[in-house]
């Protein structure tokens, strides 16, 4: 089991990671591994101490559904992650296009009057993240891909030899 670090107090320091690990070991009947936040407080402003978090047991780094919009912060975090062999998990979305949305545009969202986002928001977010991965050489997993528009970008990244994977939702 690998819980996400989007807890009430973000898992963004070795101390919070070690606390979560101890708590899981004491209460879970299954083996758990911990992910840590990529940025402090998952706010996208300052990267976490990736090396110390790896030493404390983190197996990957993610800000979960929060997009790191500052490309300088993301570039720095991806560079550190690459140097340390760490996996970064991103939620590819363009935050401007996806703000307030709860579903991807389509019949389902329309019939239920759910605030929707164009599939282009995912594609734009993924294209940006993959460009940053190409620049830094980091290992990257695109979390919760939900549109066909994202697939060509992933295919191109794999053809270029980038170390990328994806999950679907």
Question: Which sequence ranges carry the predicted segments?
Answer:
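Generic hydrophobic/packing signal
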Residues: 24, 28, 36, 54-57
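Metal-associated gating/positioning segment near the N- to mid-region
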Residues: 1-27
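Gly-rich Lys/Arg/Thr-decorated short loops/hinges at beta-loop-alpha junctions or inter-strand turns
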Residues: 1-3, 29-33, 105-114
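Short, conserved acidic/polar surface loops in the N-terminal third of protein domains
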Residues: 12-13, 44-46
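Active-site beta->alpha loop and helix N-cap motifs at the rims of alpha/beta catalytic domains
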Residues: 37-43
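Histidine/acidic residue-rich metal-binding segments in metalloenzymes
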Residues: 47-169
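Active-site neighborhood of phospho(di)ester-bond hydrolases with catalytic His/Asp-centered motifs
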Residues: 2-5, 33-36, 62, 91, ...
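Short, surface-exposed acidic/glycine-rich loop or hinge patches that mediate macromolecular interfaces
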Residues: 7, 40, 145-148
């Amino acid at each position: 089991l690998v819980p996400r670090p989007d807890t009430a107090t973000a898992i963004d320091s070795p101390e919070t990671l070690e606390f979560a690990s101890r708590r899981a070991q004491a209460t879970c009947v299954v083996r758990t591994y911990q992910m840590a936040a990529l940025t402090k407080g998952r706010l996208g402003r300052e990267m976490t101490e990736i090396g110390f978090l790896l030493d404390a047991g983190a197996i990957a780094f993610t800000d979960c559904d929060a997009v790191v919009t500052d490309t300088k912060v993301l570039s720095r975090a991806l560079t550190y992650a690459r140097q340390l062999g760490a996996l970064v998990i991103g939620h590819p979305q363009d935050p401007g296009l996806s703000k307030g949305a709860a579903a991807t545009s389509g019949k389902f969202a329309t019939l239920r009057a759910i605030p929707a986002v164009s599939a282009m928001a995912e594609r734009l977010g993924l294209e940006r993240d993959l460009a940053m991965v190409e620049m830094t050489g980091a290992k990257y997993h695109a979390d919760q891909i939900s549109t066909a528009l994202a697939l060509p970008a992933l295919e191109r990244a794999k053809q270029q030899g980038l170390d990328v994977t994806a999950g679907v939702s």
